Amino acid sequence: MAFLKLTEQNVQGKTVLIRADMNVPFKDGKISDDTRIRASLASIKYCVDNGASVIVMTHLGRPTEGEFHPEDDVAPVAAHLGSLLGKDVKVLNDWRENKPALNAGDVVMLQNVRINKGEKKNDLELGKAYASLCDVFVNDAFGTAHRAQASTEAVAQAAPVACAGVLMAGELDALGKALKQPARPMVAIVAGSKVSTKLTILESLADKVDQLIVGGGIANTFLLAEGKAIGKSLAEHDLVEESKKIMAKMAAKGGSVPLPTDVVVAKAFAADAEAVVKDIADVAEDEMILDIGPKSAAALADLLKAAGTVVWNGPVGVFEFDQFAGGTKALAEAIAQSKAFSIAGGGDTLAAIAKFGVTEQIGYISTGGGAFLEFLEGKELPAVAALEKRGA
């Protein structure tokens, strides 16, 4: 991927417009998790340390375009950013009428981009209005890269220079390393409740990987495709044929979809449900599979430890309940111990990584939920394509 990087630009004396993703959650009117704000600091600090003035823009929540309500206000985000930077970060509400006059080291924030008419439709005039504020545009919002919007795509077309921020560049470099030139063998874990939501990812990865590990409800559908009884487990009977095709595709190239030989079952989906380990052949009609068994976990752990590249999306069991967390824990620890380059993404995956304390041992943790999944699907990300076009 050829794109310009912020860290390669001379920004001294320039105004830099950074599209960040600071769409943080709130609880009782206060920011409950500032991870996304902290993730944006590297690009902002690079600009400030190198003599630039900075304009930050972000979306917050899901406001109606053309309307402004108190909950849409980015002021609490700006205040928190200011406290992290040790600076006063003002919010600009009327930036189209009054272009800000900034000095080197200043940091300001535009009001919520999603209240601007034309933002979601990728309006070129709005993109030009954003671009008119800056000498250099920086996209550092990988989480929104799969959407073509005025603050991510149109602005990149119109700005004098368009480049990737520290976070965006790191994300794209890691994804490129994992998917474009992977060290072999390459192993992917794709887990979740439904094959239907991950079908295109499964099909795309089946072309790339040497082993395709499936988990959760997805694994149950594959077990059905192998003719196994799964009791009352969650599965999609209408996707059994698609599952067979994916297994055949993997087998034809000498790979496989290794399915569990033992599982952890329960009679109910509940935090206090009794967990029983069973051979896959012994699952009863009134039981549901809620995790992979210890033998299966050990076999998959060996695959992961011998891998050159690991892509992880989704826990293989109901890890929120400790009695069904063993499989996901074993795989998380195997990835942590592996010499493979590992990349993980998706909300549940990140929660599992945090729960089992292996954050530091994962090669790269992706910040972009939907964008990460679309990259795995092999889709073009509009905001990234815009940067590549400008970097060519």
Swiss-Prot record:
It catalyses: (2R)-3-phosphoglycerate + ATP = (2R)-3-phospho-glyceroyl phosphate + ADP. Its EC number is 2.7.2.3. It comes from the Bacteria. ATP binds at residues 198, 320, 346-349. Keywords: ATP-binding, Cytoplasm, Glycolysis, Kinase, Nucleotide-binding, Transferase. One of its GO terms (cellular component) is cytosol. Substrate binds at residues 21-23, 36, 59-62, 114, 147. One of its GO terms (molecular function) is ATP binding. It is found in: Cytoplasm. It holds the Pfam family PGK. The keyword Lipid metabolism does not apply. It is an enzyme of class 2 (transferase). The keyword Cytoplasm applies. Its main location: cytoplasm. Pathway: Carbohydrate degradation; glycolysis; pyruvate from D-glyceraldehyde 3-phosphate: step 2/5. GO terms for biological process: gluconeogenesis; glycolytic process. Belongs to the phosphoglycerate kinase family. Monomer. PANTHER family: PHOSPHOGLYCERATE KINASE, PHOSPHOGLYCERATE KINASE 1, CHLOROPLASTIC-RELATED. This is Phosphoglycerate kinase. It comes from Neisseria meningitidis serogroup B (strain ATCC BAA-335 / MC58). The lineage of its organism: Bacteria, Pseudomonadati, Pseudomonadota, Betaproteobacteria, Neisseriales. The gene is pgk.
